[in-house]
Regions:
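Acidic, Gly/Pro-rich loop/turn segments at junctions of secondary structure
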Residues: 1-44, 53, 98
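Alpha-helical segments flanking ligand/cofactor-binding loops in enzyme cores
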Residues: 12, 39, 82-83, 137
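Secondary-structure junction motif
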Residues: 29-31, 43-65, 132-134, 140, ...
Length: 150
């Protein structure tokens, strides 16, 4: 999400997440190694998540350019989208942490898209006036450790 703040909250964690365009490795010759425009990408089949935070940001960016995107596949399961990209030809817009291994292993390619660098934030809050349990503190500790490992 975008950075949030309230006088009623304690922000226990905030981690910036880059959201990136990726494509099937089979599109490397056509799309890889160059700066693309969003309009150039729209000719490709898109495999996208349902209307969540990063998809909403992409749709806003497209609307500002008076452009819309109709995905070939829309699914709430990010791992399924990644598998579809790995076996078929398509493009997606996903958090870097979700696609990093597939890109490093050459199963997907990361695309450079002109004027479309987007970051969102993973955040954990607690209410200042409410009790925080040991279990909640442990959850935050584990979440921070997971971020450090990435």
């Amino acid at each position: 999400d975008e950075p949030l703040y309230s006088n009623n909250w304690n922000k226990l964690m905030e981690q910036r997440e880059e959201i990136v365009f990726v494509a099937s490795a089979s599109l490397r010759e056509e799309l890889g190694g160059k700066e693309l425009t969003i309009e150039e990408l729209l000719t490709q089949p898109f495999f996208l998540t349902e209307q969540d935070n990063y998809r909403r940001v992409l749709n806003r960016r497209l609307a500002a350019r008076r452009t819309i995107l109709t995905p070939s596949l829309e699914c709430g399961d990010t791992s399924l989208l990644i598998r579809m990209l790995e076996i078929d030809r398509g493009v997606s817009f996903l958090p870097w942490y979700a696609v990093e291994n597939s890109v490093k292993e050459g199963r997907l390619i990361r695309l450079s898209v002109e004027d479309c660098y987007i970051s969102l934030y993973r955040q954990i809050f607690s209410h200042k006036e409410k009790w925080r349990t040991r279990e909640m503190d442990e959850f935050v500790r584990v979440a921070k450790l997971a971020d450090e490992e990435e």
